[in-house]
């Protein structure tokens, strides 16, 4: 029986590397938010995460662009056959992003899907590096060339991208159209890449001031904590979610 939930630092590899039978999850660039001591100025950048299909090998010469013939569902299924990038960081980290991708054997042209968790510049500032990728930015899904397709994503209806891979609607921080990526069955359990639904471990003192809809964001946070074993936040290190068992009256 599940009881109270708490969060704690995740000890282990940096960057986070969690693998499953279907996907690996790698934090390429860890986000940060650092007060600058001048009024409310903050220097910040968002976390960038790579979701890599198991057994994927770079071969852009044989790559086929996702097709619109079968609608959004088919196009998304085709897009997740290659590397998936969750957020891109700000344009000021362009070189760092390219270098981090290269360390994983991924070139910009290899990326088949970019998921932007929300529309802030520190999270989608490098979309221009991936003109050949399908884009799911907030709730907008488009194929290369700007063909937009409806898909039906909402809080009660996730997008199923593949076995153990989903996109959830998690509104709040940036308004009503934020999304998170859920990867199930990894070596660390269920990993949820959340954008700024969680800024960092221990953000309880600050997230509401940064939220466009705190009520919706609280709902999103609770939903994520109910399933996640590891959370990848927008501006800090990944952290673990611990569910404490509640003893029954018979114990």
Curated annotation (Swiss-Prot):
Purpose of the protein: Endoribonuclease that catalyzes the hydrolysis of histone-coding pre-mRNA 3'-end. Involved in histone pre-mRNA processing during the S-phase of the cell cycle, which is required for entering/progressing through S-phase. Cleaves histone pre-mRNA at a major and a minor cleavage site after the 5'-ACCCA-3' and the 5'-ACCCACA-3' sequence, respectively, and located downstream of the stem-loop. May require the presence of the HDE element located at the histone pre-RNA 3'-end to avoid non-specific cleavage.
EC number per UniProt: 3.1.27.-
Cofactor(s) the record lists: Zn(2+)
Domain comment in the entry: Contains four of the five characteristic MBL-fold metal-binding motifs, with two waters completing metal coordination.
Organism of origin: Rattus norvegicus
Classification via InterPro entries: MBLAC1, Metallo-B-lactamas, RibonucZ/Hydroxyglut_hydro
Catalytic activity of the protein: a ribonucleotidyl-ribonucleotide-RNA + H2O = a 3'-end ribonucleotide-RNA + a 5'-end 5'-phospho-ribonucleoside-RNA + H(+)
Gene it is expressed from: Mblac1
UniProt-listed Pfam families: Lactamase_B
Cofactor, free-text remark: Binds 2 Zn(2+) ions per subunit.
Sequence positions that bind Zn(2+) 1: 118, 120, 173, 196
One cellular component term from this protein's GO annotations in UniProt: cytosol
Stated name of the protein: Metallo-beta-lactamase domain-containing protein 1
Keywords carried by this UniProt record: Cytoplasm, Hydrolase, Metal-binding, Nucleus, Zinc
Subunit structure: Homodimer.
Organism domain of life: Eukaryota
Principal location listed in the UniProt entry: cytoplasm
GO biological process terms on file: histone mRNA metabolic process; mRNA 3'-end processing; positive regulation of G1/S transition of mitotic cell cycle
GO molecular function: metal ion binding; RNA endonuclease activity
Family: Belongs to the metallo-beta-lactamase superfamily. Glyoxalase II family.
């Amino acid at each position: 029986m599940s009881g109270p939930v708490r969060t704690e630092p995740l000890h282990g590899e940096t960057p986070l590397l969690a693998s499953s039978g279907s996907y690996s999850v790698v934090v390429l660039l860890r986000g940060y938010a650092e007060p600058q001591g001048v009024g409310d100025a903050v220097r910040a950048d968002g976390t960038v995460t790579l979701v890599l299909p198991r057994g994927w090998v770079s071969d852009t010469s044989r790559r086929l662009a996702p097709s619109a013939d079968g609608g959004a569902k088919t196009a998304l299924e085709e897009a997740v056959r290659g590397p998936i990038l969750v957020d891109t960081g700000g344009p000021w980290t362009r070189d760092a992003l390219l270098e981090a991708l290269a360390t994983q054997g991924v070139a910009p042209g290899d990326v088949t899907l970019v998921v932007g968790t929300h529309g802030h510049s520190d999270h989608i500032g490098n979309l221009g590096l991936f003109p050949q990728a399908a884009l799911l930015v907030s709730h907008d899904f488009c194929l290369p060339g700007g063909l937009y397709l409806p898909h039906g994503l909402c809080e009660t209806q996730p997008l199923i991208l593949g076995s153990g891979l989903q996109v959830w609607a998690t509104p709040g921080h940036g308004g009503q159209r934020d999304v998170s990526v859920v990867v199930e069955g990894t070596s660390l359990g269920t990993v949820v890449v959340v954008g700024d639904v969680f800024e960092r471990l221990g953000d309880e003192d600050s997230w509401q001031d940064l939220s466009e809809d705190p009520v919706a964001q609280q709902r999103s946070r609770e939903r994520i904590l109910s399933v996640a074993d590891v959370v990848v936040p927008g501006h800090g290190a990944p952290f673990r979610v611990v569910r404490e068992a509640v003893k029954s009256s018979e114990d």
